[in-house]
Amino acid sequence: MALRNVPFRSEVLGWDPDSLADYFKKLNYKDCEKAVKKYHIDGARFLNLTENDIQKFPKLRVPILSKLSQEINKNEERRSIFTRKPQVPRFPEETESHEEDNGGWSSFEEDDYESPNDDQDGEDDGDYESPNEEEEAPVEDDADYEPPPSNDEEALQNSILPAKPFPNSNSMYIDRPPSGKTPQQPPVPPQRPMAALPPPPAGRNHSPLPPPQTNHEEPSRSRNHKTAKLPAPSIDRSTKPPLDRSLAPFDREPFTLGKKPPFSDKPSIPAGRSLGEHLPKIQKPPLPPTTERHERSSPLPGKKPPVPKHGWGPDRRENDEDDVHQRPLPQPALLPMSSNTFPSRSTKPSPMNPLPSSHMPGAFSESNSSFPQSASLPPYFSQGPSNRPPIRAEGRNFPLPLPNKPRPPSPAEEENSLNEEWYVSYITRPEAEAALRKINQDGTFLVRDSSKKTTTNPYVLMVLYKDKVYNIQIRYQKESQVYLLGTGLRGKEDFLSVSDIIDYFRKMPLLLIDGKNRGSRYQCTLTHAAGYP
């Protein structure tokens, strides 16, 4: 749609539903006109359409309406450019042209891109001519910084006077005209590392040169770069070479001193190990007392618990696997218990054996089996299998639901378990209906044999409700050995027996579907049994 046919956004925001409906009427959008009047959509709501508002309009008009709202919003954005023009009126001709633009649609398009350019040219001529001329004047003179162009004479004086020393001094900083000494200071810092070399030797050997002594911290950094900076100062270098040679050994000495402590530490480590190795040799001859004393002293140092392990190794070198299992056990604070098991080989500490055996039954089964004194372990293991059978019995209780599934093994066995109160084996359909109508109450039911009498369709449930008899098939699935009620398309309940079906629908309502009238949906519970008394 052309912009000349689109109203301004500011106008549309002030529309009420009636004016918006009139606009759609002009566009020949009658269906949109009805929607606007029906849902009371005003102009502001139309410009900010939400998903709910869009759904209220016809689907065919939705893309057109969304595009229309976007164009109206864009129209206002373009209009906003021209509203700012009268704020800075330069010429009376431009103001008149803007008033004409506000009046007609065609002039809006014609002046879309012409008038702003004209205004910019005018503004450039009026606003930016004088500062440019003022800037060019000092640039032609000396091309240096000047204060703001408040007075031309003062600006020329301030710019000419500091401008002369700058090119002569070759300074990097142009923004500091008032002080002529400041440009000389910035080149000094690059010279400081060059001048920093003489002050430390001068401070050590010669007392003159107090000003450069402020940089005593920098010589440490510049020592690494002395070779590259030697040729620059020729006067002070005569004193430096001997100082550098003397400084080199001082620098080497701390490195040698730093290397000496690790050498002194290393012999201390094997010394500690040698002590640990000699300890088990002293403790080996008396087995029971030394091991107990060693364990009491072992918690004090952190490296001694592995030492008794090396003492145990020669005693049990034949069985490496036992050592692997026994070594991790004494580590977690069970050392006194594990130490008592080894002296069990001797006949003296017999009363101490039952304690470790009760706490650690499976750790030293070999040692316990070889000695009769550990008689407390066999009863423990004998009690284990006695306790295990009930655990197995509990495991056998888990598959107990399995025998529940074969409860309906076959329809033949199911017939014997059916209740004669509601089951009649040999009866025709008319006879069954007659039996139901004798009671003639809603919810009267009975189960009879199916006319087909197959394994998949063994029985039929007949229900009387509102003077109508409903016949519902009872199906049997061999694979899952369950009974299903109905065709299986709607019902998902499966039952283990026919009696379960009857008991369930005596409590829960049964859905009754008429084959002739599918729309009728009745529900009733099974209340009155119509079997033989």
UniProtKB/Swiss-Prot annotation:
Phosphorylated after T-cell receptor activation by ZAP70, ITK and TXK, which leads to the up-regulation of Th1 preferred cytokine IL-2. SYK-dependent phosphorylation is required for recruitment of PI3K signaling components. Disulfide bonds: none annotated. PANTHER family: LYMPHOCYTE CYTOSOLIC PROTEIN 2 (PTHR14098:SF1), SH2 DOMAIN CONTAINING PROTEIN (PTHR14098). This is Lymphocyte cytosolic protein 2. SUPFAM superfamilies: SAM/Pointed domain, SH2 domain. Highly expressed in spleen, thymus and peripheral blood leukocytes. Highly expressed also in T-cell and monocytic cell lines, expressed at lower level in B-cell lines. Not detected in fibroblast or neuroblastoma cell lines. One of its GO terms (cellular component) is cytosol. Keywords: Cytoplasm, Phosphoprotein, SH2 domain. The modification Phosphoserine is found at S207, S376, S410. Residues 15-81 form the SAM domain. CDD domains: SAM_SLP76, SH2_BLNK_SLP-76. Residues 337-350, 365-376 have a biased composition (Polar residues). Its main location: cytoplasm. The lineage of its organism: Eukaryota, Metazoa, Chordata, Craniata, Vertebrata. It is found in: Cytoplasm.
